[in-house]
């Protein structure tokens, strides 16, 4: 990994490498308001992107109009050339500090979707994310297949337990951004989110 960063730095590819993570981690982000009625849905979507012509934005495998009904999105205004850099952080493997260093060096903000284990075991890195102006989103407490959770109480528990850890750690409310684990979601998840 060290060699990768050295080579990338020499070739000026640090931001390009970080941008590639966005492509690899492309999943639905829900701007959750933690409210709404629940309706059962058996159809599970395994989130993914497909890429068309060079220079064109990727297309998701869920219709943007459908997602918009639930205040969910995977990309914003396509007329504006903006890249939203996001990371899923379920465990620490030594990469987060160098990523944060690179983001800071280039003054690039990012969003980190964290699970409970990360919040519990990496408090210094979480605080650093917040102090350096990054956004921390909710990736659930235990990273289950949320599309398999049918009752709203269990669904909320996964999100609220993570929110409580974040609040205890940072003294702030966790932003209402949710990314479903494994990229799996269904209509009832969108309604509960």
Regions found by a protein language model. Give the residues of each.
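N-terminal pre-catalytic segment of deacetylase/amide-hydrolase enzymes
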Residues: 2-86, 91-105
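Structural recognition of the beta-strand scaffold that forms the well-ordered cores
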Residues: 83-86, 110-114, 135-140, 176-180
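Second-shell loop/turn segments in exported
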Residues: 85-86, 90, 114-115, 143-153
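Short beta->alpha connector loops
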Residues: 90-93, 116-119, 183-185
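Catalytic domains of cell-wall/extracellular-matrix polysaccharide-remodeling enzymes
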Residues: 98, 120, 143-193
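Acidic (Asp/Glu)-rich catalytic clusters
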Residues: 99-106, 119-139, 193
């Amino acid at each position: 990994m060290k060699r990768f960063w050295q080579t990338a730095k020499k070739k000026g590819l640090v931001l390009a490498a970080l941008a590639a993570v966005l492509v690899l981690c492309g999943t639905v982000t829900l701007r959750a308001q933690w409210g709404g009625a629940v309706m059962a849905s058996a159809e599970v979507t395994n989130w993914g992107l497909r890429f068309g012509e060079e220079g064109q934005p990727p297309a998701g495998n869920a219709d943007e109009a459908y997602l918009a009904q639930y205040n969910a999105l995977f990309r914003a205004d396509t007329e504006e050339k903006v890249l939203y850099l996001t990371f899923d952080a379920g465990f620490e493997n030594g990469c987060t500090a160098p990523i944060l260093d690179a983001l800071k060096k280039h003054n690039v903000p990012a969003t980190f979707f964290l699970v409970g284990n990360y919040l519990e075991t990496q408090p210094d890195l979480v605080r650093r994310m917040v102090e350096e102006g990054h956004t921390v989103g909710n990736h659930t407490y235990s990273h289950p297949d949320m599309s398999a959770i049918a009752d709203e109480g269990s669904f909320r528990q996964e999100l609220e337990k993570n929110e409580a850890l974040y609040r205890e750690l940072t003294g702030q409310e966790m932003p209402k951004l949710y990314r479903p684990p494994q990229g799996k979601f269904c209509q009832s998840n969108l309604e509960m989110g």
